[in-house]
Amino acid sequence: MFARLPDDPRPTVAFTFDGASVDARRGDSVAAALVAAGHLAHRLTPVNARPRGPWCMMGACHDCLVSVDGVPNVQGCTVAVAPGMRVETQRGARAIEAAAASPAFAVDDSVVLALDDTGVGDRSDALLDIAVVGAGPAGLAAATVAAEAGLRVALFDEQRQAGGQIHRGITASPLARPAVLGADYWAGGSLVRAFERSGVRHGAGASVWSLAPRDDGTLALAVSSGPTAAPRSALVLARAVIVATGALERPVPIPGWTLPGVMSVGAAQILLKTAGVVATRGTVIAGSGPLLWLYAWQCLEAGGTIDALLDTTPRGRLARALPHAAAFLMSRYAAKGYELVRTVRARTRVVEHVDALAALGDDRVEGVRFGVGGALDSLACDTLLLHHGVVPHATLALAAGCDIAWNDAQACFEPVVDPWGGSSLPGVWVAGDAANVAGADAAAPRGALAALAAANALGRFDAAERDRKSRPWRAALARALRGRAFIDTLYRPADAFRVPRDATIACRCEEVTAERVVQALRAGASGPNQAKALTRCGMGPCQGRLCAPTLTALVAETCGISATEAGTYRQRFPVKPVTLGELAALPGSAAADAAVLRIDRNR
């Protein structure tokens, strides 16, 4: 279960959930407030009317959908609570029937993207030099460096504050003891402050859902402000775009992973960072990777409780990583990692080499069954937090047409980029974890390098000046990458947790099981896209973000081919669900049509 930490200085905000009063804190998201109050099921699925609750808390999974003031399909993790707000369980497809008669709920003006203030639109004087998408370390560094070069820059991000997921909530922390998050979290403050001083226009609360090249060589981005009383959308025109959309947690498709109370470790960390909500008794953490140990340490330091940590790192993986140990030991990750693991092991039960997991329960998680070398055991729990690493969140770049390649070391697809982050699409750079997962320390230098390359391409300075300015960033990147090969080898997710079996859910949105996907493949489906057409896997509101890695793994195993041959979903615009009101708010122009419909005039 979860509990709110004491000494939260924020004022109380009251709203209702299914008619019952709920006390939140100002700044809480709807989803965070509900979880803190013990409400873990927020919607019923359209297909089988099964209860679901938040999985990711970062706007990717759509399992936190609720009805707000009569408006359905609202992501509870992206909307702040307001006094008197009426929140209701979203009850499957029936909720959609009421949408047409419901006025859009209002949100705080500070959340609404002031599109006029960013100077974008169809006017000839509205052309940006660089549009940056994403306000994490890579995006903040890119925007700041580009502004320092004298370029006209705007940054767009879905969150209300800058910082990205890694530094989520850094500008408005509710924690009375900030040290529980660790020094690395607060180091992001310097990036945020530099960005705020840069004068870059910040489109907060903005969803960028289309990116397309134009005939004149510029790029067009469709941007919307979300479900407001008067939806605002615009066509942002830029000479260059830097996609810095970060990473998202890899799906963990084990039996029962869709039960309310089963969440990603990253979701629990976001609850701590943004709402001062911590896991307490009845919590089990399972999986592998640095974030697993980091959150366990943060939770315990904050006063939370972890009943057990089930480590799924396979036997023999440490021996396989040893050839990379020298570089790792010279990195700052070694000492930090040792201290995290030592502290957690001293304060909670750790089970190593777990090779099987299943969440138990009917309408919510009630326990976890796990196996070690064929021996099975179980633990009672009401909260199960899962993590098996992260993958690039590059949906926007993929939909725009950027080439991708399989990274076998990290078991994921990633955009193909040059040493500056330049993609295969002219004028588009991909920076930070959106291009290759290497953590926050590497993200900021990569964002800066992308900005320098874009400035050079736009004629702001020559290649020699670009190279001179890049030297400190190259040095910082080299330091950040030292030891990454050890981490990638040690924590590469085991196939047992990437390839679901039988009736295990592969697609959370459409409730498609692994066996249905396998049946489609054996019936002749040639890959993820045909399997999608036959089963609806990947057709839900998350648009394949959560099941794409799973489909690649299922196709590769079932068809006996490599992941490269299996491929992944073909991404389309809009890359995020948008309302008809947001579409209608776009300017009526050929440029807008081309950006939204991805019209290829050469065909």
Region annotations inferred by a language model:
Residues P54:
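Cys/His-rich Zn2+-binding cysteine-cluster or related metal-binding knuckle/ribbon modules and their
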Residues S21-D23:
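N-terminal intrinsically disordered, low-complexity segments enriched in P/E/S/T
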Residues F2-V13, R26, A31-R50, G59-A60, ...:
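Residues forming the flavin
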